[in-house]
């Protein structure tokens, strides 16, 4: 049955307008994004198939063009639309971090980092460069690596901090395994970065590890 034949209160678009986006399931939200289904399959049914295929909304959003286009009804146009939505969300969160002391918006920091790093199939190491008032100067992807690790070089991080005239930094990296628990190597690296940056008067405020369902803060753990 086409969505247009459903009772009005059950149609995703009308439901969103009446009750707000938070009232919709992942499949219903995705159906609004898709707009139409394919022959014999409604947009909601197609959305459910996509979520089942990828396993989660996070993995769907992190899919490559090749992975995305393998499925019926999907292609470069839909992929481009999805990437545009993701990028707009990231930029909106990044704007929040530039407007004041980043330490006053810990949840915004977590949201931004999750959106940027969660679901990536390889490890990515990110640095947020801050001014003396802890306002964001720029966020950079400093290093990336394999499924299990990224090689991080403190000397290169110091160079970037000096280039941006940063007074403080926040680091983050993802664990493609989905487990956010910091490793011993993560702790050693964080201390190495902290010591190297201290030599040029740059303070390390935190280091976040991003998993599939959890974010661990080194500062909250007392590891900074």
Curated annotation (Swiss-Prot):
Keywords, ordered alphabetically: Hydrolase, Metal-binding, Metalloprotease, Protease, Zinc
Gene Ontology terms for molecular function: metal ion binding; metallopeptidase activity
Keyword presence, Ligase: no
Entry-linked InterPro entries: MPN, RadC_JAB, RuvA_2-like, UPF0758, UPF0758_CS, UPF0758_N
Ranges of residues in domain MPN: 102-224
Short motif (JAMM motif): ranges: 173-186
Domain of life: Bacteria
SUPFAM superfamilies, sorted: RuvA domain 2-like
CDD domains: MPN_DUF2466
Hydrolase recorded as keyword: yes
GO biological process, one term: proteolysis
Residues holding Zn(2+): 173, 175, 186
Protein family (similarity comment): Belongs to the UPF0758 family.
PANTHER family in alphabetical order: DNA REPAIR PROTEIN RADC, UPF0758 PROTEIN YEES-RELATED
Protein name: UPF0758 protein NE1464
Lineage, uppermost ranks: Bacteria, Pseudomonadati, Pseudomonadota, Betaproteobacteria, Nitrosomonadales
